[in-house]
């Protein structure tokens, strides 16, 4: 706007050059969704053990897995929210007829 008494004609509505497309700073690069789940050399896979109980019969269940940090955080979130539970091999056999 210019002048002591601004008017509608003084407004500059061409703001496209002032807006960053995705809040990228310091030459950051957007990754496609396919690249998000690839494990890079920098992101190492580590062993992780979970001791819990069966959802159905409450017998002790121990699971060892290998995952990257992002995978472990996602798993932890699912477990804490109750969206993921484990079952023992005996319950799995009786429920799923040996996986068939």
Curated annotation (Swiss-Prot):
Zinc finger (unnamed): 54-91
Keyword field contains Glycoprotein: no
Pfam family, one: E7
Motif Nuclear export signal: chain residues: 72-80
Sequence segments annotated as region (E7 terminal domain): 1-42
Modifications after synthesis and translation: Highly phosphorylated.
rRNA processing listed as a keyword: no
GO MF annotation list: DNA binding; DNA-binding transcription factor activity; protein domain specific binding; zinc ion binding
BP GO annotations: DNA-templated transcription; symbiont-mediated perturbation of host cell cycle G1/S transition checkpoint; symbiont-mediated suppression of host innate immune response; symbiont-mediated suppression of host type I interferon-mediated signaling pathway
Keywords of the record: Activator, DNA-binding, Early protein, G1/S host cell cycle checkpoint dysregulation by virus, Host cytoplasm, Host nucleus, Host-virus interaction, Inhibition of host innate immune response by virus, Inhibition of host interferon signaling pathway by virus, Interferon antiviral system evasion, Metal-binding, Modulation of host cell cycle by virus, Oncogene, Transcription, Transcription regulation, Viral immunoevasion, Zinc, Zinc-finger
InterPro entries listed in its UniProt record: Papilloma_E7
Superkingdom in the source lineage: Viruses
GO terms for cellular component: host cell cytoplasm; host cell nucleus
Location(s), subcellular: Host cytoplasm; Host nucleus
Subunit annotation: Homodimer. Homooligomer. Interacts with host RB1; this interaction induces dissociation of RB1-E2F1 complex thereby disrupting RB1 activity. Interacts with host EP300; this interaction represses EP300 transcriptional activity. Interacts with protein E2; this interaction inhibits E7 oncogenic activity. Interacts with host TMEM173/STING; this interaction impairs the ability of TMEM173/STING to sense cytosolic DNA and promote the production of type I interferon (IFN-alpha and IFN-beta).
Domain remark in the UniProt entry: The E7 terminal domain is an intrinsically disordered domain, whose flexibility and conformational transitions confer target adaptability to the oncoprotein. It allows adaptation to a variety of protein targets and exposes the PEST degradation sequence that regulates its turnover in the cell.
Task of the protein: Plays a role in viral genome replication by driving entry of quiescent cells into the cell cycle. Stimulation of progression from G1 to S phase allows the virus to efficiently use the cellular DNA replicating machinery to achieve viral genome replication. E7 protein has both transforming and trans-activating activities. Induces the disassembly of the E2F1 transcription factor from RB1, with subsequent transcriptional activation of E2F1-regulated S-phase genes. Interferes with host histone deacetylation mediated by HDAC1 and HDAC2, leading to transcription activation.
Family according to the record: Belongs to the papillomaviridae E7 protein family.
Name assigned to this protein: Protein E7
UniProt organism field: Human papillomavirus 4
UniProt lineage: Viruses, Monodnaviria, Shotokuvirae, Cossaviricota, Papovaviricetes
């Amino acid at each position: 706007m210019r002048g002591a008494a601004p008017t509608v004609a003084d407004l500059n509505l061409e703001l496209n050059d002032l807006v960053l497309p995705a809040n990228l700073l310091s030459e950051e690069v957007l990754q496609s969704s396919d690249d998000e789940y690839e494990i890079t050399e920098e992101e190492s896979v580590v062993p992780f053990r979970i001791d819990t109980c069966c959802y159905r019969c409450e017998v002790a269940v121990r699971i060892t897995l290998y995952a990257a940090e992002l995978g472990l955080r996602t798993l932890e979130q699912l477990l804490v929210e109750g969206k993921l539970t484990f079952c023992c091999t005996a319950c799995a056999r009786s429920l799923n007829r040996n996986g068939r």
